[in-house]
Structure formats: C-alpha cells, structure tokens
C-alpha cells in the first residue's frame, strides 16, 4: 500500500477517518492525500478574483477549508509521512473516483454519519455508489470508534462469483495487522437454503 486517499468534510466521523488514515499510512509507510470537495453557488474555477468578492461567504468557507487542510498536512508530516492536500469544487462522486484513479490510490478511508449523512454532501452521491464503483478497498468510518491495527476482518460474499482478487487484498491487510479473517455469507429470504447448504459455497471457497 503506497498511497492512501482520505476524502473529508471535516465532520466528526471524517475526523476519525483522518486519524485512521494517518495510522494506516504509518503502518504501511504510505503517502497520504486529504481531499475536500466544496459546493459553491457558481462555477468557482471560472471566476476571476474580482468576481470572487461578490461571494464573501464562499471565500470565507474556502479559507477555512484551506486552513483545515493545512493543519492535516502538518499533522501527517509530524508523523513522518509524505502528505498532499487537495481542494476541489463541485463535481460529486466523479471527482473522488477520478482523483483516486489519477493518483493510483491503493486505499480510500472516509467518514459517514449514515447513508444520508455527511458523506452524501461530501461526494454528491450516496456512499454505497462510491464503494461499488471504486477500484480499491474503501473503509467507511461511522459513529463507532475504530481501533487500528484491525483485530478482526469480516469478508462478506455469496461466494458464488470469483472474489479471489478482493480476498487477496483482505489477506494482505490481515497479515499486516495480525488480524483474524471471518467469512460471512448471508442467507436472504429468497435463498431458501438450509444452514448446511448455505455453508457449502464457503467450504468450497
């Protein structure tokens, strides 16, 4: 793991994600990127300095965001990490995924207060879409405290499709953290499987 991305809206759970990202970067000796996405009343990147003055509240918010990102950069650097910060405007989830792909991040860590919480405003879309579309593992930090290194990792799958690549990533993380891996297959009400039959794909896996 060489590069970790931490999208943040500076909320409480994103603060916890920032801390987790730093701890992971320390363990892996990775570079860490903090990314903040702002909604603006107009297409901000096309405004000149004179027109920006027409939106004093937005200018203030941008200043606060830059200051917070600067503090995050200093915090990471005090831990001996290489760090970069990014502030972008609008664009939604595409900006997050495009940024991650451009910089070849190996991992994404961010925070959410729920499916309709801060992550929705941060990414302009539901967090599940980010999880589904990202090409790298994503950790979403919610209200519970997160301890790191991880002690237990649950790998959830129907085990009917080829999930070997994803499982290799889980093994790599578990080995680095010294964590136990638990395999979980959920029997839904449409499966009509007995417990034993439901376990068969896991045993074959």
Put a short name on every predicted segment:
Residues 109-112, 137-143:
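Short beta-strand elements of ligand-binding domains
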Residues 37, 113-114, 143-145, 186-187:
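Short, ordered loop/turn segments at secondary-structure junctions
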Residues 1, 104-106, 136, 150:
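Local beta-strand N-terminus motif with an aromatic residue
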Residues 107-129:
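Glycine-rich, Arg-bearing micro-motifs that act as flexible, cationic patches
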Residues 13, 67, 71-108:
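Structural beta-alpha unit
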Residues 1-52, 152-205:
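Small/aliphatic-rich secondary-structure junction motif
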Residues 53-67:
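A short acidic, glycine-rich active-site loop
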């Amino acid at each position: 793991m060489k590069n970790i991305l931490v999208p943040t809206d500076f909320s409480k759970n994103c603060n916890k994600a920032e801390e987790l990202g730093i701890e992971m970067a320390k363990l892996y000796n990775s570079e860490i990127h903090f990314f903040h996405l702002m909604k603006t009343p107009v297409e901000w990147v096309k405004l000149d300095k004179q027109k920006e003055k027409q939106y004093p509240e937005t200018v203030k918010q941008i200043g606060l965001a830059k200051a917070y990102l600067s503090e995050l950069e200093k915090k990471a650097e005090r831990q001996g990490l290489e760090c970069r910060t990014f502030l972008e405007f609008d664009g939604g989830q595409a900006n997050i995924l495009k940024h991650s792909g451009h910089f070849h991040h190996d991992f994404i860590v961010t925070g959410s207060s729920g499916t309709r919480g801060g992550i929705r405003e941060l990414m302009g879309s539901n967090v599940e879409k980010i999880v589904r579309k990202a090409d790298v593992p994503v950790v979403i930090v919610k209200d519970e405290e997160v301890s790191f290194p991880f002690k237990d990792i649950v790998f959830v799958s129907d085990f009917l499709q080829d999930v070997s690549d994803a499982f290799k990533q889980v093994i790599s993380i578990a080995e680095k953290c010294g964590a136990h891996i638990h395999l979980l297959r959920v029997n839904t009400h449409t499966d009509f499987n007995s417990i034993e039959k439901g376990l068969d794909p896991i045993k074959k896996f």
